[in-house]
Amino acid sequence: MKSVMIAAATLAATSAASATLTQWSVVSTAVSNSGQNMIRYEVFATFNGATDTLLNVFNFGAVGSGQQDWYGGFWHKDNSDYNGGVLSQTYGTWAPQLTGSATANRPFDSFLLIGGNPAGTNSSNADPSWNSGGTGAHVGSSIGWSRADLVNNGTLGWFNSSPPNLQGRVGTAPNTATQVKVGQFMLSAGHETRTYTLTAGYNNGAGGSVQFFTGTFVLPAPGAIALLGLAGLTRRSRR
């Protein structure tokens, strides 16, 4: 089952430039691997300008009750030396450069990026927010994003370290004419609905000033996905 949901969002700032990030969008797909039933959630920044360019995202955080558990439980199947392509919730990395095979690993791996393909040439990097703050099992440390969980400090972010390569621009393959991928989250099929907030920095790709957008996106439980579909609140993905 695959569906697309439009996240509730609030525009944090605008300018005279034509670039507008209108919302976070989520594509959900049921998959199975290594005996595990999972839901793959792909999160995209959706724009309305022909050259809109995503630069970075930050202030990632869970919203609502039970959120302490929402920083963990992600599946990884990356090709890092501490994971080796084994599906795991204990070991993994969020670095897109280490995702591995486009068929054997990528469809079942959690990773973060600013557009482009999750491959060795991707120029997305973790910002310093991964190195400190947070509490309990999800505290930040010097390992950065080389971990299976997420830091719960409310400032978590990542960025394109080489903006001139236009990796974060709409229409630059594999980005579509309106969307730039910012992450893929793999969760067990029985998980509870999770809501996250995220802020983006972007411009119109043509010399415009940097603008900022803050909004929420939802990773719904499988039952919620089905109910939304019956209510006509989801649509089939064209991706």
Locate the predicted segments by residue:
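Ser/Thr/Pro-rich, low-complexity mucin-like regions
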Residues: 29-38, 46-52, 152-215
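Hydrophobic helical h-region of N-terminal Sec-dependent signal peptides
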Residues: 6-10, 224
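Short helix-loop boundary/capping segments
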Residues: 121-176
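Low-complexity, serine/threonine/proline/glycine-rich extracellular segments that form mucin-like
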Residues: 29-144
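Positively charged n-region of N-terminal signal peptides that target proteins for export
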Residues: 1-4, 235-239
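Cleaved targeting-peptide boundary
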Residues: 19-26
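A short, hydrophobic C-terminal helix/tail in secreted or cell-surface proteins
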Residues: 220-238
